[in-house]
Amino acid sequence: MNVSHASVHPVEDPPAAATEVENPPRVRMDDMEGMPGTLLGLALRFFQFLFAAAALCVMASTSDFPSVTAFCYLVAATGLQSLWSLALAMVDVYAIMVKRSLQNRRLVSLFAIGDGVTSTLTFAAACASAGITVLIDNDLNSCAQNHCVQFETSTALAFISWFAALPSFLFNFWSLASR
């Protein structure tokens, strides 16, 4: 049998050209930390859910929040934010458990649009609630008749939820734009 084996006749790699050494091929990092399906992405989703649910519970625990439209808007926005974050946290847990990448173009588009919408709604609701809270506390001086501490706490928690949602949106949007 005349079969040639690599161990018998070793073949050397040709030397690299000068252009390949100067310009190495671009490597794309598909699973950067903070993206969907990573541990940091899961942590961001968890904190989004935690702070949005806390803002929702604190605001809903007051008896007079339905009388102000901005506070109703905050309850609706944080409710949507908490549901969205919880659903995507479950998707992240699944992806981490089965070691699956969530870098599908359609999924990233859905995540980017959903994160953009929910974070914008949460930010707008927190800003509106902050304006009403300042009006009640500073301008009208009627905190004795209202639940100002709960309003301020809920507004602060909504802002913190938005701060946790913003990196998720930026990572997804960056991943979508870099394709």
UniProtKB/Swiss-Prot annotation:
It is found in: Cell membrane. Residues 1-38, 92-115, 177-179 are cytoplasmic. Keywords: Cell membrane, Membrane, Transmembrane, Transmembrane helix. InterPro entries: CASP_dom (IPR006702), CASPL-5 (IPR045009). Its main location: membrane. The chain crosses the membrane at residues 39-59, 71-91, 116-136, 156-176. Residues 1-24 are annotated as: Disordered. The keyword Transmembrane helix applies. This is CASP-like protein 5A2. Residues 60-70, 137-155 are extracellular. Homodimer and heterodimers. It is a multi-pass membrane protein. Belongs to the Casparian strip membrane proteins (CASP) family. GO terms for cellular component: plasma membrane.
